[in-house]
Structures are given as C-alpha cells and as structure tokens.
Regions:
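Structural preference for beta-strand elements that scaffold enzyme active sites
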Residues: 2-6, 46, 74-78, 98-101, ...
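Conserved, mostly hydrophobic/aromatic
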Residues: 8, 39, 47, 92, ...
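Conserved anion-binding
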Residues: 12-15, 19-23, 97-171
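Glycine-rich, proline-tolerant flexible connector loops at the mouths of alpha/beta enzymes
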Residues: 46-62, 104, 165-175
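Glycine/small-residue-rich loop that forms an oxyanion/phosphate-binding "nest" at active or ligand-binding sites
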Residues: 53, 58-118
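Charged helix-capping and loop-helix junction motifs
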Residues: 60-67, 141-150, 175-183
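Catalytic cores of alpha/beta
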Residues: 73, 77-96, 180-215
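Glycine-rich phosphate-binding active-site loops on the catalytic face of alpha/beta enzymes
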Residues: 94-112, 197-201, 213-229
C-alpha cells in the first residue's frame, strides 16, 4: 500500500481543515517545499496536494507551488482542487505532475472525465467525497442525492483507474477512517482505492493495508505526531 503524505494549500501556505470547513484552517508548517523535502527524508515516494483556494474559486490558484514540488523534489505529485477544464489537466500533465484528481466535475460534468481518461489514461484519478454515503461537491459545500458507490461504478465504466475516497465527517478529525465504506467500495469496483480522512495512527494504516487498499492519505496525523510517517511507510513496503 502507498502512503500519501498530504499538503493542503491556502494562500500558498500548508494548512489543514477540520471536516472540510474552511473557517477551521490552521497553518501546519512554515512552507511547502521544506515540508515536501521532509516527506522525502521519511521515505515517501508520493505526495497528495490540494489547491483549496482552487476548490472554492473553481480554477487553478496555487498551481505554481504544486509544480515546484514536482520539479524540486523526487516526489510523485497527485493534485486535486480547482481542476474544471481540459486545459487545467494539460497544464499539470505538462509540468511534471503524476496524477490529476477530478472531483466535483465527476458528478457535474462526467463527459470531461471521459475525455480526460481517453487522452491521459492513468494520469486521471477521481476524488469521491461523501457525507453519510452521499457525494458532496464544490469544496464540500454542496450535497447531492448520488450514492458514492453509484458514482464509483460510473467512473469505473469510463476507465478511471484510481479513486480517492474521502469521508468528510472523518477528515481532519483523527478519529479513524471509515473502513466499512472503504471495504464496500474496494469490493464494488476494480479501481485502485485510496483512503482519505480520519487516518490517525499506525493501527489505521495496518487495517487499511490488510483490507487490500491501494493507498492511504495522511495529513493531520503527520503534523500532530499521532502517526510516524517513517513507520507507516515501512509497514506498507
């Protein structure tokens, strides 16, 4: 299983949110590049980055900082937030980004996902964010009546390789991941499933690993010290 240390960005700074609420944003480190280098030193090969300003503004905002990580470290970068058009995907694909995560557009504009997968293949992943099993969009500010499994199956049928599943009620809470939903999703589709939200300690990592998940995104647990990144990477080798 892959471990994805996370950097969420507002105003060019690394932050974390509680349950996706922008009013709870807390800066968690001094700067992005130094933080990314610390992940490399811990043995990470990937990093999960989110342009939170982009999520709200529905356009790329912090893309320069994200591209800098791809070009100034050895990390493979996956990026989500504010990606609404093919030109956004083009930009990241041509600037060293290894995976582009389509979120809100998966529900609102599935034709874009289809076109993107056709052109970029496994570079494209889909982020499914859910509250009580139903998909939320636009930086989690809008709900829907679409069940997360239904959206996942639709994405699978379009050829999407990787799905990042976030349980919003767990995100930034350090209360453990929603293992039940993750296992249900992993069994329902053939896509690689990455867990996001609630990962707290090494036991969570081992549980996700033993349930056959592809990856785990770790944010607040690293910054608050409840998870040792070096150990997390070691138990997943």
């Amino acid at each position: 299983m892959l471990i994805f240390p996370a950097i969420d960005i507002i105003d060019g700074k690394p932050v974390r949110l509680y349950k996706g609420d922008f009013a709870t944003a807390q800066q968690v480190a001094d700067d992005i590049i130094t933080t990314a280098h610390s992940f490399v030193d811990a043995g990470a090969t990937w990093i999960h980055m989110v342009d939170l300003d982009g999520s709200l503004k529905k356009e790329r905002v912090n893309h320069r900082a994200i591209v800098d990580v791809a070009n100034q470290t050895s990390l493979k970068v996956e990026i989500g937030g504010g990606i609404r058009k093919m030109e956004d995907i083009d930009f990241y694909a041509n600037n060293g980004i290894s995976r582009v995560i389509l979120g809100s557009v998966a529900l609102k504009n599935p034709a874009l996902v289809k076109e993107a997968v056709k052109e970029f293949g496994s570079l494209i992943a889909v982020g499914i964010d859910a509250k009580n099993g139903f998909v939320a969009t636009e930086g989690w500010t809008e709900g829907s009546d679409t069940h997360f499994i239904d959206l996942a199956k639709q994405m699978e049928s379009m050829g999407v390789d990787t799905i990042i599943y976030t349980d919003i009620s767990k995100d930034g809470t350090l209360s453990g991941p929603n293992v039940e939903h993750l296992v249900e999703l992993n069994n329902a589709v053939s896509c690689n499933i990455t867990a996001s939200g609630g990962v707290t300690n090494i036991n969570d990592i081992i549980t996700l690993r033993d349930n056959g998940l592809y990856g785990a995104i770790c944010g607040k647990s690293i910054y608050q010290g409840t998870l040792d990144l070096v150990k997390a990477i070691e138990v997943c080798r």
